[in-house]
């Protein structure tokens, strides 16, 4: 078996928990995931099975979330799973004020990751240092947020904001919640997070673990084809002789102006062969997925 599974990660599970469960369900060792999700988050977790694990590095990095920010609360983890540092009612906060501030988080921004995160500093993961009580300065990173759209606003002593966020890889939604609360000196924390899109996969097409188990028992499960999430890349087809040479590591001269990574197929069978790099009319093998003889 090889391909992808668009998994709807359940609440409370780590991404590694999901991989371990799928290894048992599928009776395969070669299982991996793209884009780690926090245990408290749910939604799209792309799972690669078999040889498709070699394609994880080529998946698109765009992601989308539905997030709930709670104002007036600050925690150690920047979500509701951590210890409360401060709690102060802020019923006077208005949606118009919040909307005005959202523009500060759109575009390429400098973001300090939460101290409870898998980021490594000096070879150590931040959450390991945090659990030991060690204090360390977390360096800011450049991330990109494409859009933030307001979905709902609930007034109260601890008002909540629902937003849809589209962003690039490495963006921490917990950090956005924290920093948004800091602007108003109220504190802010992430109350809920659903990933609605990741690496070419959408929540509407995802499977829960129960769905997957049901399909496996019925013998109806088929993984998503290995090249399905790579449709953002242009494609190149090679006749059988050229395809064979390319799969053996040879460069193929092509009269094409395209430059960059491409999907490569055998013309006669439309078999996905792998990922190539086009450079000035030459197709260079990057990753041979399906060698042919």
Curated annotation (Swiss-Prot):
List GO BP terms, alphabetically: mRNA pseudouridine synthesis; tRNA pseudouridine synthesis
What reactions does this protein catalyze?
uridine(55) in tRNA = pseudouridine(55) in tRNA
Root EC class: isomerase
User: According to its UniProt record, which residues of this chain constitute the active site?
Assistant: 38
Which pairs of positions does the record mark as disulfide bonds? none
Function of the molecule? Responsible for synthesis of pseudouridine from uracil-55 in the psi GC loop of transfer RNAs.
Q: Per its UniProt record, what PANTHER family does this chain match?
A: PSEUDOURIDYLATE SYNTHASE TRUB1, TRNA-PSEUDOURIDINE SYNTHASE
The record ties this protein, via NCBIfam families, to: TruB (TIGR00431)
What's the protein here called? tRNA pseudouridine synthase B
Q: Which organism is it from?
A: Trichormus variabilis (strain ATCC 29413 / PCC 7937) (Anabaena variabilis)
Taxonomic path? Bacteria, Bacillati, Cyanobacteriota, Cyanophyceae, Nostocales
Q: Which gene encodes it?
A: truB
């Amino acid at each position: 078996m090889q391909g992808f599974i668009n998994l709807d990660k359940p609440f409370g599970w780590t991404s590694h928990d999901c991989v371990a469960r799928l290894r048992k369900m599928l009776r395969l060792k070669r299982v991996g995931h793209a884009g780690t999700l926090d245990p408290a988050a749910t939604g799209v977790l792309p799972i690669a099975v078999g040889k498709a694990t070699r394609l994880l590095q080529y998946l698109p990095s765009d992601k989308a979330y539905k997030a709930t920010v709670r104002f007036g609360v600050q925690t150690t983890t920047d979500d509701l799973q951590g210890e409360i540092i401060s709690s102060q009612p802020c019923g006077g906060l208005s949606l118009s004020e919040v909307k005005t501030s959202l523009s500060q988080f759109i575009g390429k921004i400098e973001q300090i990751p939460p101290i409870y995160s898998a980021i490594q500093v000096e070879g150590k993961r931040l959450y390991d240092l945090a659990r030991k009580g060690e204090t360390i300065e977390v360096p800011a990173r450049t991330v990109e947020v494409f859009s933030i759209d307001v979905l709902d606003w609930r007034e109260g002593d601890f008002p909540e904001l629902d937003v849809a966020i589209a962003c690039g890889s490495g963006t921490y939604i917990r950090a956005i919640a924290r920093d948004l609360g800091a602007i108003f000196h109220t504190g802010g924390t992430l109350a809920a997070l659903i990933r609605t899109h990741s690496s070419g996969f959408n929540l509407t097409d995802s499977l829960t673990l129960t769905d997957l188990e049901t399909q496996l028992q019925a013998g109806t499960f088929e993984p998503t084809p290995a090249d399905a999430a790579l449709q953002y890349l242009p494609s190149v087809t090679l006749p059988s002789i050229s395809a064979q040479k390319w799969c053996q590591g040879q460069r193929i001269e092509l009269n094409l102006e395209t430059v960059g990574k491409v999907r490569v197929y055998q013309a006669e069978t439309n078999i996905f062969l792998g990922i190539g790099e086009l450079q000035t009319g030459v197709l260079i093998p990057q990753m041979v997925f399906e060698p042919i003889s």
